[in-house]
């Protein structure tokens, strides 16, 4: 089966000087969190889970 030919927009290449990957755009809605805050929150979450495991081990006995 032959597909109908459609025109596609040419692929664009970012030729700007900023080669750092953008995690969010300025126009996007929602919470804008930097990588340092994400790392800090994930470490807090891991510590909280470890504390819950330790508390569960001692309260079950």
Swiss-Prot record:
Which coarse location class applies to the principal site listed for this UniProt protein? endoplasmic reticulum
Which BP terms does GO give this entry?
A: cotranslational protein targeting to membrane; post-translational protein targeting to membrane, translocation; SRP-dependent cotranslational protein targeting to membrane, translocation
Record's Gene Ontology CC terms?
membrane; Sec61 translocon complex
Give the membrane topology. Answer: Single-pass membrane protein
Q: Which residues lie on this side of the membrane: Cytoplasmic?
A: 1-35
Q: Where are the transmembrane segments?
A: 36-56
So which stretches are on the Extracellular side?
57-61
Q: Does the keyword Cell membrane apply?
A: no
Recorded GO MF terms: guanyl-nucleotide exchange factor activity
UniProt keyword annotations, A-Z: Endoplasmic reticulum, Membrane, Protein transport, Translocation, Transmembrane, Transmembrane helix, Transport
Q: Mind telling me which InterPro entries this protein's record contains?
A: Sec61-beta/Sbh (IPR030671), SecG/Sec61-beta/Sbh (IPR016482)
Q: Where are the coiled-coil regions?
A: none
Subcellular location, record wording:
Endoplasmic reticulum membrane
Spell out the Pfam families in the cross-references. Answer: Sec61_beta
Protein role: Component of SEC61 channel-forming translocon complex that mediates transport of signal peptide-containing precursor polypeptides across the endoplasmic reticulum (ER). Forms a ribosome receptor and a gated pore in the ER membrane, both functions required for cotranslational translocation of nascent polypeptides.
- Which protein family is named in the record? Belongs to the SEC61-beta family.
Subunit structure, interactors included: The SEC61 channel-forming translocon complex.
* The name this protein goes by in its record: Protein transport protein Sec61 subunit beta
| Protein species of origin | Dictyostelium discoideum
């Amino acid at each position: 089966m032959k597909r109908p030919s459609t025109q596609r927009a040419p692929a664009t290449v970012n030729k700007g000087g900023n080669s750092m990957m953008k995690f969010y755009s300025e126009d996007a809605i929602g919470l804008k969190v930097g990588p340092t805050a994400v790392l800090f929150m994930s470490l807090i979450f891991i510590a909280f889970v470890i504390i819950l495991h330790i508390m569960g081990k001692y309260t079950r006995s």
